[in-house]
Amino acid sequence: MIDNFAGKTAVLTGAGSGFGLECARIGARLGMNLVLVDVQQDALDAATAEMQAAGAQVLARKVDVSNAAQMEQLAADVQQRFGAPHLVFNNAGVGAGGLVWENSVKDWEWVLGVNLWGVVHGVRLFTPMMLAAAKADPAWRGHIINTASMAGLLAAPNMGIYLSLIHI
């Protein structure tokens, strides 16, 4: 466990709203360096301004988490600015409603891209950095958190694509 979060680095996807934004606020209060990631520039800009006003060191990036090249660049930027992150919150998520047989291939690709590949990219890119940091310093601690959903326990109607991912 991490005992003192001051000066530690957190990477938060979906940081422009919801859980991601709330976790960024908590991180700022705890004195963390924040890497804010969102696909919506206006939400990212607002979150960045709020965290900087709270005194946090912020690296903000507009990134489509489903895009491997964008995520690879994000990981390189994080490594260069802060080193290995102590916390990675793979939080970005989307859902397409409607009848599953009426959803388009684009709908499926969008939801699978963000909700599945976003997590895959976050884990595959940041885990090696974190393991290297822990090998260099046995006292170093880090955590990866992947957002889950109540939909894994209680299925909502007309959310077929989203629900197909929850039960993988």
Feature roles, as predicted:
Residues I2-L34:
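Canonical Rossmann dinucleotide-binding motif of NAD(H)/NADP(H)-dependent dehydrogenases/reductases
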Residues W101, L154-G160:
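Active-site loop immediately N-terminal to the catalytic Tyr-X3-Lys motif
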Residues V123-R124:
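A short, exposed helix-loop element centered on a Lys and neighboring polar residues
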Residues H167-I168:
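Conserved small/polar residues in nucleotide/adenosyl-binding loops
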